[in-house]
C-alpha cells in the first residue's frame, strides 16, 4: 500500500465534502453535535442544489459530453469532440461538461468556437482539476451527486467519449435511470467504436446472455465514430420531444436577464 497512488487511511490531508458526508461521525460533545452533524451538512447540500439550479435555470435541452481528463489535444478523439460540440453549438444546443481538461476541454472548446453556450460543472477533488479556458459559464461543486444531477437535469442527450472510471460511472448511471424508468429515454451515444467494442461485447455476450439485463437494454445506447451522426441523433431526438412553451419562455426570459 505504501506505493499506492490512492489515498490511504493515514492520509492527513483535509477531507473533501463527499468524504465528510460518507464518514461515520466520531463521538462529539453536545455543543459540537449540530454544527458538525450530518443534519447540518444536509443544509449545505440543499444550498448547493439551489445554487446549481439558479445558475442553470436558463439552460434547456443541452447535451452533456463526457470523457477522459487525460486525453491530449493531439488525440483523434479530442479533435472529434471539438467537432461534435461545434456542430451542436451551431445548432443552438448548449454543451455541458465536467469543466476540466481532456475531452471536457475539447467539448467546451468546440462549443465556444461554434458560438454556443459552453458550460463547465467542475468538482472539488483532493488533487487539483482546474477549469479549462473555454467556458462561458463555470460552476464548481463540492458534492459529486449534486453535480451529476445537473448533468442529467439540463441535458436531453449524453455523448460519451473514451474515458475511465468517472466516465463509466456517469454512463452507467444514465443507463440505469433510463432502464428503471426514472427518466424518459434520451440518447446515450458512445463515441469511438473501437474503444467501446470490448464493453459492448461484454454487455452482449456475458451480461445479456446470462440474463442480468434484458436484450432490449442493449438498445439504450448508440455507437458512432462520426461527429455529424452524433449531432444528428441528438437533433432527431429533440425534434420528437413535445415543446413546453412555458419552459421555453421562462428560459428565454432568464437568458435575457443575465
Predicted regions and their residues:
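Glycine-rich beta-alpha loop segments
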Residues: 2-14, 18-22, 27-121, 130
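Active-site/ligand-binding-proximal alpha/beta "capping" segment
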Residues: 142-194, 238-243
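Short acidic, glycine/serine/threonine-rich loops at helix termini
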Residues: 108-110, 130-133, 170-173, 200-203
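Short gly/pro/ser/thr-enriched loop/turn and capping motifs at secondary-structure boundaries
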Residues: 124-130, 167, 195-198
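Solvent-exposed alpha-helices and their adjacent loops that cap or buttress functional pockets
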Residues: 56-58, 87-89, 111-112, 129-133, ...
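C-terminal functional extensions of proteins
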Residues: 190-258
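Acidic/glycine-enriched connector segments
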Residues: 79, 102-161
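Structural motif
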Residues: 61-64, 94, 116-120, 136-138, ...
